[in-house]
Amino acid sequence: MPVNVDRLKDAVEVLGNRVRIRVYVKPEGRERRLRLEEGELVFYTDEPPLEGRANASLINFLARGLKVSVKNIEIVHGARSRSKVVEIRDVADPDALLERLASIVDEG
């Protein structure tokens, strides 16, 4: 079930036409999903944390769910860590992007 946008405020930062999302990644799961657990976004992926596969899974999941180009998404902090900061660039309408984010996040 999607969450309310207000519940994402601790995990999201809007910087003009950029949006930064703090995500904790749990690799080698059964499926790909994004959950809100105790105020933190947690991405579960079926990919292992090898050769950037879990990172690519996260970027592709966000691109598809948020309807943005993969080239506009970058992991700006934590590429080799499970705690990451993902930046989405060239966001025309941050409020609409946050609504789309809320629609792909499950309650944890």
UniProtKB/Swiss-Prot annotation:
Gene3D superfamilies: YggU-like. Disulfide bonds: none annotated. The lineage of its organism: Archaea, Thermoproteota, Thermoprotei, Desulfurococcales, Desulfurococcaceae. Belongs to the UPF0235 family. It comes from Aeropyrum pernix (strain ATCC 700893 / DSM 11879 / JCM 9820 / NBRC 100138 / K1). This is UPF0235 protein APE_0182.1. Pfam families: DUF167. GO terms for cellular component: cytoplasm.
